[in-house]
Amino acid sequence: MNGYSKKEYLKTSYEEIRKGVAKLPKDYKQLTWEEITALKKAVSTVNNVITLSVTELFVDFLKNENIIGEEQYQEIKKQIENTKPNANGYDIEYNGNPKIIAEVKCNIPVNEDSFGAAQRTGIIEDLESLQNGKGKSCITNTEDYYKFMVVLSDKEGNVKKAMRKIINGGDGIEEYNGKITITTDKVYI
């Protein structure tokens, strides 16, 4: 173990943000440069908290769907806990049995049920890296891996609608509905 705890890091960062928010001026025009950069850091921390939560929920899903067993579940959870936010590679890189890679995307569509250009580009790049490998990962050949793109869901269903616009007719991409057999030749959303 490397002594790093993602949960402890995010808990400390979040607590610093929570204490600092009350001190901000009501009008954004009165923000100092230091306050603006603190807000930017706060947004990054909140994004990391959301990504961690969604990643952990996905691992619970893998176990509940009997895609992995208890031993794999514990190994993946430990790996997630010991990986720093925004580390190179996939959000989940599991080389056990079964081999699993996953990208976790917590994008909220900027146009109600459509992603903006930068969001769309990032999602497409991640889908391609799941299919073809990623230069910033120790996994360059994804052929033997179950591949997942995990997305944040919202009450209105806008994220799902926006994702469907991207994957509609996409070769090798399928929306997981629980009624299919997972194979290594597709990316499941």
Which residues does each PLM region occupy?
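Interdomain/boundary linker segments immediately adjacent to catalytic/signaling cores
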Residues: 1-70, 80
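Catalytic cores of nucleic-acid endonucleases
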Residues: 104-169
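Active-site beta-strand-loop-beta-strand hairpin of nuclease catalytic cores
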Residues: 90-107
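Long amphipathic N-terminal alpha/beta scaffold segment
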Residues: 66-94
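Surface-exposed cleft-lining segments at the edges of enzyme active sites
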Residues: 41-45, 76-80, 111-119
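Extended hydrophobic/Leu-rich segments
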Residues: 36, 73-80, 108, 182
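Non-catalytic C-terminal interaction segments of nucleic acid-processing enzymes
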Residues: 1-16, 163-189
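Short, well-structured alpha-helical interface segments that form or flank functional binding sites
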Residues: 49-53, 57, 85-87, 122-125, ...
